[in-house]
UniProtKB/Swiss-Prot annotation:
Name used for this protein in its record: Protein psiF
InterPro entries per the UniProt record, alphabetical: Fibro_Slime (IPR011874), PA14/GLEYA (IPR037524), PA14_dom (IPR011658), Prespore-cell_inducing_factor (IPR051154), S_mold_repeat (IPR001673)
Cleavable signal peptide: 1-19
One GO cellular component, as annotated: membrane
Family: Belongs to the prespore-cell-inducing factor family.
Region (Disordered) residue spans: 682-708
Subunit architecture: Forms a complex with dicB.
Compositionally biased residues, Polar residues: 682-702
NCBIfam families: Fibro_Slime (TIGR02148)
Record topological domains on the Extracellular side: 20-643
One Pfam family from the record: PA14
């Protein structure tokens, strides 16, 4: 009798309960061994084929290339072949949308499952679509029942889940399966293999899925996360895909392709020419769920045509692509050497030779001709002097009318004419007197004796005294003050009124470059590069010949919609963007390639016998036991049919199917007690047809009249 009761209870439960469904449009990618060597290789199960974090495109990244099984078969040949697994690649894989229908598990409100032991969703689709197949001759593959099937495909299903770290996801099937939560790998069943199973237990995750540093949280933290399910069928002769979960999968958005949390993969960028591309819009950017993405495509540059040589000016030619011309640093000065620094792009215009200034020479450069060396002009405009320049002293102006006759007086007129007037009683026939170094010889008219007078030389300035060189009888000019010493050829001395000198550069070593320190030593110029270092690793230190040191902050390229990149210790470091909402019961999350998305909060229940919702008053989740409870949540007494009436009389909450069992086996009183405990939803016992009196005045054997 007990077993009959249980059977009736189950029959009634199933008949009174309509299975709920959740439908999600996901992406399938049809491959074929004709194009991809990764398919139809019997290489066995293998973990570690993909990295533990999803790539920036939200797809797995292969971790081992050229890895082979003992028979020499590839697991994954290379990154190029792997790309077609979860991407549409022209001539290799074809994108096909697929409706994944999850069915509520019988006897449980919170569990949903998918079960297919003959999982061939792409038969007559993808490469096997007659309109696409064309002239390709595909090998025909059969299952164990000799039926032709499309075995070679992959699937990516993306959901959003809210967790309190109690949920589970159970999978059973073949071949590759990878599950990522918040982009972190939590289930790895890779390789071509027979049916295998695996479980994601949120309470015991193998990897940390959150960023909190609180060690007490473990690998799971209550919150909302993306859930990505990657599946591949890569080999004959069976295809199984079964999973069950109480993770409340939802979609944060649908892209314009209709895909749950999709990346807009039905849209393909169109290359217009060598320089411009018509780019697809962001997956969730169309207004009001529109699907006409073609109207929202934008034209963007295909090639930035940049290069490492900053002395080249790059541009793009629509026909030929990138081209460049050399940057001009010509300053129009023929006395400079023009150059461009390929690392910085700065121009330098360095003098070809430094300007040399001495007492008698100005070695400058004529910017229009490029000619050098200009003698010092010592012309004093006096016709009565002979103008010359003595190196180290400068200009010397010697009287022009000296006839070297001791018996004449020499003079010069304003027009430069010399006059030599004889000196009276001067004996020019004086006997020959022996010469003496640095002496002027004369003879006395009266005595005929030789007279010697020291040679006197005119000094070029008040700062020098002139003496006679006893060897050459030429003038030697010595500085009166040490400040007038010109032994260093890098300087010349400028005489002051107080008979001291001011040292001024004799050689111009300025190379017109703010990036060098200019100096002179031993008559030679030195131009030493300065060090531009501000000790900040987040600046690019360069030097401009016209401006000197320039410290340019490193600007990090913003390549992500979910991270902001800033410089730290010389590297661009991502900081996650916080997507927050002030609207109660609205959740938010950031998806790479999409940005921030906002959606109604889904609350995880406390257990499998409860449902949860978000309170619009508090914005917090509230978990509440199902009423009536699902059969699986009933007490043992109810499940086995022991003491049914007592259970109802005791006020145990039970469902309609069990209530029907009570009506059959527990008697009307038990049923009435259950009905009363339901809050008088029914108005009377007559609401149950099993307890309605026979309208033909006959006896209903299951009906007992109310006690008087």
């Amino acid at each position: 009798m007990k077993y009959l009761f249980i059977a009736i209870i189950l029959i009634l439960y199933c008949s009174f309960t309509k299975a709920d469904q959740k439908k999600f449009l996901v992406n399938m990618y049809d491959n074929d061994p004709l194009f991809s060597p990764d398919f139809e290789n019997a290489n066995g199960a293998q973990t570690g084929l993909v990295k533990k974090k999803l790539g920036s495109d939200g797809k797995p990244i292969p971790a081992n290339y050229d890895m082979k099984d003992p028979n020499g078969n590839y697991y994954i040949k290379n990154a190029t072949t792997f790309k077609s697994w979860f991407n549409e690649v022209a001539g290799v894989s074809i994108l096909v949308p697929f409706e994944l229908v999850l069915t509520q598990t019988a006897g449980s409100q919170n569990y949903y499952s998918y079960s297919n032991t003959s999982f061939f969703p792409l038969n007559e689709l993808g490469w096997y679509n007659p309109s696409i197949k064309g002239d390709y001759e595909f090998k025909k593959y059969q299952d164990s029942n000799k039926k032709e099937q499309n075995f070679h495909f992959c699937m990516h299903a993306s959901f959003i889940m809210s967790t309190n770290c109690k949920e589970v996801f159970k999978f059973k099937g073949d071949d590759d399966v990878w599950v990522f939560i918040n982009d972190v790998l939590v289930l790895d069943i890779g390789g071509v293999h027979g049916v295998q199973d695996g479980t994601v237990d949120m309470a015991n995750l193998p990897e940390k899925i959150h960023d909190s540093t609180n060690s007490k949280l473990g690998n799971c933290k209550n919150g909302t996360y993306p859930f990505d399910f990657f599946y591949c069928e890569r080999h004959t002769k069976a295809s199984n895909c079964l999973f069950e979960t109480n993770m409340g999968f939802t979609c944060s958005y649908y892209d314009y392709c209709g895909i749950c949390n999709g990346k807009g993969e039905c849209c393909t960028d169109v290359k217009l020419n060598q320089c411009y591309t018509k780019k697809c819009p962001l997956p969730n950017s169309l207004p009001n769920g529109a699907t006409n993405y073609q109207d929202y495509m934008t034209i963007v540059p295909t090639n930035t045509c940049g290069g490492t040589d900053k002395c080249k000016i790059y541009s793009c030619n629509n026909s030929t692509g990138c081209e460049f011309k050399q940057k001009s640093c010509d300053d129009g000065d023929k006395c400079t050497k023009d150059a461009c620094d390929s690392k910085t792009g700065y121009c330098s215009n360095i003098p070809t030779n430094p300007s040399v200034v001495t007492s008698c020479l100005k070695s400058g450069c004529d910017s229009t001709t490029g000619n050098y060396s200009t003698p010092t002009n010592c012309d004093d405009k006096d016709p009565c002097t002979i103008d010359s320049c003595i190196n180290g002293q400068g200009c010397v102006h010697t009287k022009a009318c000296d006839d070297e006759d001791p018996c004449t007086t020499d003079s010069c007129s304003a027009d430069g004419k010399c006059t030599h007037t004889a000196i009276a009683k001067c004996n020019s026939d004086c006997p020959s007197c022996p010469s003496k170094k640095c002496k002027i010889t004369s003879c006395s008219e009266d005595s005929g004796a030789c007279n010697y007078v020291d040679m006197v030389f005119a000094s070029p300035s008040e700062c020098y005294k002139a003496t006679c060189d006893p060897e050459t009888e030429e003038a030697i000019y010595s500085p009166i003050d040490s400040s007038c010493d010109t032994s260093d050829s890098c300087f010349t001395a400028q005489c002051n009124l107080n008979k001291t000198c001011t040292r001024v550069p004799a050689i111009n070593c300025d190379d017109n470059n703010e990036c060098t320190t200019d100096s002179c030593s031993g008559g030679s110029c030195s131009n030493t590069a300065i060090a531009c270092d501000d000790n900040d690793p987040c600046t690019i230190d360069t030097c401009s010949p016209s401006e000197g040191c320039i410290f340019t902050p490193i600007v990090c390229e913003q390549t992500s919609l979910c991270n902001t990149f800033t410089c730290s210790v010389g590297k661009c470091v991502p900081t996650p963007i916080t997507c927050s909402s002030s609207v109660k019961c609205q959740d938010s999350i950031c998806r790479e390639g999409v940005g921030c998305v906002y959606f109604n909060r889904t609350c995880p229940p406390d257990d499998d016998c409860s449902s949860a919702y978000c309170s619009m008053e508090t914005g917090k989740c509230i978990s509440k036991a199902y009423d009536p409870l699902p059969f699986s949540c009933q007490s043992t007494a109810v499940k086995v049919g022991v003491g049914i009436g007592a259970a109802a009389a005791a006020g145990i909450a039970i469902g309609g199917a069990v209530a029907a069992g009570l009506a059959i086996f527990g008697g009307k009183k038990a049923y009435d007690t259950w009905k009363t405990s339901r809050g008088n939803v029914m108005t009377g016992s007559q609401s149950n047809p099993l307890y309605t009196q026979n309208q033909n005045n006959g006896n209903n054997p299951l009906y007992s009249a109310p006690a008087e």
